[in-house]
From Swiss-Prot:
PTM: Phosphorylated.
Domain notes: The tetratricopeptide repeat (TPR) domain, forming a carboxylate clamp (CC), mediates interaction with the highly conserved 'EEVD' motif at the C-terminal ends of HSP90 and HSP70.
InterPro entries, sorted: STI1/HOP_DP, STI1_HS-bd, TPR-like_helical_dom_sf, TPR_2, TPR_rpt
Chain ranges for the short sequence motif Bipartite nuclear localization signal as given in the UniProt record: 250-267
Disordered: annotated segments: 199-261
Biased amino acid composition, Low complexity: 199-209
TPR repeats by residue range: 2-35, 37-69, 70-103, 253-286, 288-320, 332-365, 392-425, 427-459, 460-493
Keywords: Acetylation, Chaperone, Cytoplasm, Nucleus, Phosphoprotein, Repeat, Stress response, TPR repeat
Organism the protein comes from: Triticum aestivum (Wheat)
UniProt KW Nucleus keyword: yes
Protein name: Hsp70-Hsp90 organizing protein
Length: 581
C-alpha cells in the first residue's frame, strides 16, 4: 500500500535516514504516481542529502500535479537554492506566497534566496582538508600536471581525471583518493614539496602524448538590479460593520494573549489560562492560543488537558490551513505531555510516534531533541527491566569457555547477552574486544576497548586490548600512547611494557625507511587524513622549512632549533611523510 510506504518514509526522514526515506517514497510513488505529496516528501529527502538535481525534478512534478499547493513551491525553491540558482529560488518562493501570503516558511525561504543572490562568493577556509582541496581549483592545476613529466601521462587516464574532477567539485573528498599514488604525486606537485611515495609506480608508465589542459569556464550568475517603481497608494476602502467588529475582536484577542504570556512568565498559571481562554472566545482562527494554553497545562502537570488542547489545535489548524510550523508545535506539545505520562505508564511509543508526526510537519531541533530523549527513555526503561548481574556473570563465563575453545562468534553472542544484562561490567567489553581482534574486526574491537576504559580507567586490560588493536592497525604512535596511559595505573605491567617495546621497534624501523613501499603508502594515506598533518602541510612556514630540508640543509638545522618546528617535523617523520636516512 502507498500509505504504508509513505509512513515508513516519514519515519525514516524523522530519524535522519534520508536515503532510506527517499527509497520508501519511491516505493509509494510506484503505487500512487499521481499523489503530489509523495513527490514533495521525496524532494525534501533528496535535498537533505544534497541531491538537489533530483530534488528539483520531484519539486517540479509536485507543482505540475498540484499547482495551487503552496508547499510545492517551497520544495521547488529549496532545490533551486541548493543548486545555487538564487533567482529561480526566489521566483518559486514568490509563486508560493501568491497562494499563501502568510506562510512563514515561504517568507523565510524568499529571504534566504535574496540574501544568497546579494552575497559575494564565499572563500573556503585556509586550513585542513578543504584548504588542500582548494589547491585543486583553477586552470593552474592542469598547467602544472601537463608540464611535469612525472604527471603528464595522468591526463590520458580517465579514472584519474574523474577523481580530479570530483575533488574540484567537492574539495573535502580529497581524503577518499589519497591512497592512490597518482593523487599523492599530484598533491606533492601542488604543495611544491617532496612527499615520499612508492617509486616506479605502474601508473606513471605511459607513452601517450600529453593532452592540453582543459579550459575551465567559471560561470558567474548574472545579477540585475531592479529599481522598483513606487506603487500608487490605493484609496481607503470602506469597511463594513461586521468586518470592523471582526478586526476589533482579533485585536482584543491579541491583547489577551499578551496578558497571558506575561502571566506565564510570572508563573501565574491560573491567570494565564484565563487570558488564553478569553482570547479563544474572541478569535478561534488563531491556534496559537490553544498551543499556549497547552504549554501552561504542561507546567501545571495537567497533561490530559494539554493533550486535548493540542488535538483541537491540530484539527483546527488543518481546517484553517494554518502554517505547518504551528501544527508541528501543537504535536510537539502533545508529545511532551505524553512523554511525561509515560514515566508512570511506561509506554513511550505513542509519544515517540507523536514527535515523529511533528517532524514531518516541520523539522526543528527542539522536537528532534525531545524525540531522542523519549527514545532514550524507552531504551533505558527496557534496559532496567532486563538488568540482572547474576545472569550477566553466567553469560560471561559461557563466553570465556567459548573463547578458550576458539569459538569466537559463539563467545561474542554470550558476551552480547552479558552486556544486555549488565552494561556496566568493564570485563565483558574487554573480553568481547579480544574476540573481535581475533576475528580481525578491528573497529569493533577498538570501540569495545575504549568502552572498557571508560567504565573502569584503572582496569589495565582495557589498555592492552586497545593498544593491541592499534598495533594491528599499524598505528604504532597511538598504540604506544595507550600502553603508556595504562602504565600510570600499573607501572610494572609486563604486557604493557612489551607493547611499548614492540611499538618502538616498528617506529624506528619506519623512520629508517626499512618498510615496504606498500606499507609506506598505507601509512602516508592514513596520515594525510589527520587534521594536524593537513594543517602542517598547508602552513606556509612549514612548507618553506620542508623545502629547505631538500635544498638547504644548513638552514634546515637552524629551523630545528625552534621546538615548535622540531615537533612538527617529528610528527611528519612519524607519519612517514618525511623520512630520515
Amino acid at each position: 500500500m502507498a500509505d504504508e510506504a509513505k509512513a515508513k518514509g516519514n519515519a525514516a526522514f524523522s530519524a535522519g535516514r534520508f536515503e532510506e526515506a527517499a527509497g520508501h517514497f519511491s516505493d509509494a510513488i510506484a503505487l500512487a504516481p499521481a499523489n503530489h505529496v509523495l513527490y514533495s516528501n521525496r524532494s525534501a529527502a533528496l535535498a537533505s542529502i544534497h541531491r538537489y538535481s533530483d530534488a528539483l525534478a520531484d519539486a517540479e512534478k509536485t507543482v505540475e500535479l498540484k499547482p495551487d499547493w503552496a508547499k510545492g513551491y517551497s520544495r521547488l525553491g529549496a532545490a533551486h537554492l541548493g543548486l545555487g540558482d538564487a533567482a529561480s529560488a526566489a521566483a518559486a518562493y514568490e509563486k508560493g506566497l501568491a497562494l499563501d501570503p502568510s506562510n512563514e516558511g515561504l517568507k523565510a525561504g524568499l529571504a534566504d534566496a535574496k540574501k544568497a543572490a546579494a552575497a559575494p562568493p564565499r572563500r573556503a577556509p585556509s586550513g585542513g582538508a578543504d584548504a588542500i582541496g582548494q589547491m585543486f581549483q583553477g586552470p593552474e592545476l592542469w598547467t602544472k600536471i601537463a608540464s611535469d613529466p612525472a604527471t603528464r601521462a595522468y591526463l590520458d587516464q580517465p579514472d584519474f581525471m574523474q577523481m580530479l574532477r570530483e575533488v574540484q567539485r567537492n574539495p573535502s573528498s580529497l581524503n577518499t583518493y589519497l591512497s592512490d599514488p597518482r593523487m599523492m604525486q599530484v598533491l606533492s606537485l601542488m604543495l611544491n614539496i617532496k612527499i615520499q611515495t612508492p617509486q616506479d609506480s605502474d601508473f606513471s608508465q605511459s607513452s601517450s602524448p600529453s593532452q592540453p589542459p582543459p579550459q575551465q569556464q567559471k560561470q558567474q550568475p548574472e545579477t540585475k538590479a531592479r529599481e522598483m517603481e513606487p506603487e500608487p497608494q490605493p484609496e481607503p476602502m470602506e469597511v463594513s460593520d461586521e468586518e470592523k467588529e471582526r478586526k476589533e475582536r482579533k485585536a482584543a484577542a491579541l491583547k489577551e494573549k499578551e496578558a497571558g504570556n506575561a502571566s506565564y512568565k510570572k508563573k501565574d498559571f491560573e491567570t494565564a489560562i484565563q487570558h488564553y481562554t478569553k482570547a479563544l472566545e474572541l478569535d478561534d482562527e488563531d491556534i496559537s492560543y490553544l498551543t499556549n494554553r497547552a504549554a501552561v497545562y504542561i507546567e501545571m502537570g495537567k497533561y490530559d488537558e494539554c493533550i486535548e488542547d493540542c488535538d483541537k489545535a491540530v484539527e483546527r489548524g488543518r481546517e484553517l490551513r494554518a502554517d505547518f510550523k504551528m501544527v508541528a508545535r501543537a504535536l510537539t506539545r502533545k508529545g511532551t505531555a505524553l512523554a511525561k505520562l509515560a514515566k508512570n505508564s511506561k509506554d513511550y511509543d505513542i509519544a515517540i510516534e507523536t514527535f515523529q508526526k511533528a517532524l514531518t510537519e516541520h523539522r526543528n531541533p527542539d522536537t528532534l531533541k525531545r524525540l531522542n530523549e523519549a527514545e532514550k527513555a524507552k531504551k533505558d526503561l527496557e534496559q532496567q527491566e532486563y538488568y540482572d548481574p547474576k545472569l550477566a556473570d553466567e553469560e560471561r563465563e559461557k563466553g570465556n569457555e567459548m573463547f578458550k575453545q576458539q569459538k569466537y562468534p559463539e563467545a561474542i553472542k554470550h558476551y552480547n547477552e552479558a552486556i544486555r544484562r549488565n552494561p556496566k561490567d568493564a570485563r565483558v567489553y574487554s573480553n568481547r574486544a579480544a574476540c573481535y581482534t581475533k576475528l580481525g574486526a578491528m573497529p569493533e574491537g577498538l570501540k569495545d576497548a575504549e568502552k572498557c576504559i571508560e567504565l573502569d580507567p584503572t582496569f589495565t586490560k582495557g589498555y592492552t586490548r586497545k593498544g593491541a588493536v592499534q598495533f594491528f592497525m599499524k598505528e604504532y604512535e597511538k598504540a604506544m600512547e595507550t600502553y603508556q596511559a595504562g602504565l600510570k595505573y600499573d607501572p610494572n605491567n609486563q604486557e604493557l611494557l612489551d607493547g611499548i617495546r614492540r611499538c618502538v621497534e616498528q617506529i624506528n624501523k619506519a623512520n629508517r625507511g626499512d618498510i615496504s613501499q606498500e606499507d609506506l603508502q598505507e601509512k602516508q594515506s592514513k596520515a594525510m587524513q589527520d587534521p594536524e598533518i593537513q594543517n602542517i602541510l598547508t602552513d606556509p612556514i612549514m612548507r618553506q622549512v620542508l623545502m629547505d630540508f631538500q635544498e638547504n640543509p644548513r638552514a634546515a638545522q637552524d629551523h630545528l632549533k625552534d621546538p615548535g618546528v622540531a615537533q612538527k617535523i617529528q610528527k611528519l617523520i612519524n607519519a612517514g611523510i618525511v623520512q630520515t636516512r
